[in-house]
Swiss-Prot record:
The keyword GTP-binding applies. The keyword GTP-binding applies. This is GTPase Der. It comes from the Bacteria. Residues 364-450 form the KH-like domain. InterPro entries: G_ENGA, GTP-bd, GTPase_Der, KH_dom-like, KH_dom-like_a/b, P-loop_NTPase, Small_GTP-bd. NCBIfam families: GTPase_EngA, small_GTP. Residues 4-167, 188-363 form the EngA-type G domain. HAMAP family: GTPase_Der (MF_00195). GO terms for biological process: ribosome biogenesis. GTP 2 binds at residues 194-201, 241-245, 306-309. The gene is der.
Length: 454
């Protein structure tokens, strides 16, 4: 189905992200009083209107080439160039400033074909529009309050009228191998998480083969989670770049706290999580905390070590890190890191293959009959312990209650007598027997009772 793109454009802190959240009916963009929170393009289906994609953009700031502000503006220019309709957002409280006039000229220069709507935000109270608004030269204008939802439906009417009147409008189609937003949510939700500056955004750009998200030597460049739909070997994937996660006591600014919370929210909604480790810093406690959180949420884990091009004694380094992972990552025994260089595009294919395989394991189901045959063999190879009164503990029956991740319910006569080591044995044996990827957590639920089918 064809989908038109509406780009929200303007100087920093005029309320573009608030309007984006309002139009998409989801809090996908972080909103903060501090200017420059949005640094990458964010796409979402506008749930208020059918067949419409809305794009949040970084604030337009005119700066020297190579600066962060300049690179952010390049992100906005991509959105301006591809948009069918541009909502040029200005601030009614500050009024029209010289930078607004520069932004208007920039829009006209880079997109002469699309219609532009002047959206005057923060008009909670009625205002009188002076000539400075009209001097911007846009025929369509509307006063709204994105924060309070005033004028949103009226804005929607203007957008729909433009789309219906302009028969020549070229709209986005979702038949491309890689598109920025797909109306149908892809099967595999793949989150890339890790400490700041470990190369998450560089990894995204490397596999997409384009500068989709901002990168640089500065720590903490990514603030919002950024979603990109993509296809790999026939598998639809939603890649999600996230803000780096530092230790709690190191997070002092409220905007960083919002970014970290957004990252943890992304983990909760992901299927598979790539936990990226900086090879120059090695495995740290914060990496283990991220892994532990993702495992507790039931996400599949793919462990990736980036920046391996900066390591001189690679064999010694990998041997030592493998040892540390085997010792420290006890929740998912047997997981092996994948060593890459996102900057040099080295070994990226191995990561993608592992993600697809882990996803298949994560949603695997085993029939009840096959499962009980496995259980009988596992208990035969390693019998259960005796109870205090000399009677052996018995697991009488098991069934898989859910996948994503695999969850097994086992009925036994004495739950307390089954220790943690035997539970780990069952999990490891199950994964080995049914070819479950090492990064997939398997959950066991023990219930005291008889076989419910006898």
């Amino acid at each position: 189905m064809p989908q038109a793109i509406v780009a929200l454009v303007g100087k920093p802190n005029v309320g573009k992200s608030t309007l984006f959240n309002r139009l998409s009916l989801r809090e996908k963009s972080i909103v903060h009083d501090l200017p420059g929170i949005t640094r990458d393009r964010k796409y979402a289906k506008a749930n208020l209107f059918s067949d419409l994609i809305v794009v949040d953009t970084p604030g337009l700031e005119f700066a020297a080439a190579g600066s962060l502000e300049f690179n952010m503006m390049q992100q906005s220019l991509v959105a301006i160039n591809e948009a069918n309709i541009i909502c040029f957002v200005v601030d009614a409280i500050t009024g029209i400033l010289p930078i607004d006039e520069e932004c208007a000229n920039l829009i006209r220069k880079h997109n002469k074909q699309s219609s532009t709507i002047l959206v005057i935000n923060k008009t909670e109270k009625p205002i009188i529009l002076d000539k400075s608004y009209y001097k911007l030269g846009f025929s369509e204008s509307i006063c709204i309050s994105a924060k309070h939802g005033q004028g949103i439906y009226e804005l929607g009417d203007i957008i729909q009228n433009i789309l219906s009147e302009d028969k020549k409008i070229n709209v986005l189609t979702t038949t491309n191998t890689k598109c920025e937003y797909n109306q149908q949510c892809p099967e595999l939700q793949l989150a890339i998480v890790g400490r700041p500056n470990c190369g998450k955004s560089t990894f995204i750009n490397a596999i997409l083969n384009e500068e989709r998200v901002l990168t640089g030597p500065e720590s903490g460049l990514t603030r919002n989670s950024v979603e990109v739909d993509w296809k790999y070997c026939g598998q639809l994937i939603r890649l999600v770049d996230t803000a780096g996660v530092r230790k709690k006591n190191a997070v002092t600014q409220s905007c960083e706290l919002l970014s970290v919370n957004d990252t943890f929210k992304t983990i909760r909604f992901a299927n598979i999580v790539i936990v990226m480790i900086d090879a120059t810093r090695g495995l740290e406690q914060q990496d283990l905390s991220i892994i532990s959180y993702a495992v507790n949420e039931g996400r599949g884990i793919v462990l990736v070590v980036n920046k391996c091009d900066l390591i001189k004694k690679k064999e010694e380094f990998q041997k030592e890190l493998n040892r540390l992972v085997a010792y420290s990552v006890f929740q998912i025994k047997g997981i092996n890191p994948i060593y890459i260089s996102a900057k040099e595009k080295f070994n990226l294919e191995s990561v993608l293959q592992k993600c697809v395989l882990t996803y298949a394991s994560w949603q695997k189901r085993v029939t009840t009959g096959t499962l009980n045959q496995w259980l009988a063999k596992a208990m035969s190879n390693r019998p259960l312990p005796f109870q205090s009164h000399g009677k052996r503990v018995k697991i009488k029956y098991c069934t898989q209650t859910k996948a994503r991740p695999p969850t097994i319910k086992l009925f036994c006569n004495n739950i307390e007598s089954i220790d943690e080591s035997y539970k780990r044995y069952l999990i490891n044996n199950f994964k080995l027997n049914f070819d479950i990827a090492a990064g997939v957590p398997v959950r066991l639920s023990f219930v005291k009772g008889k076989n419910p089918y006898r």
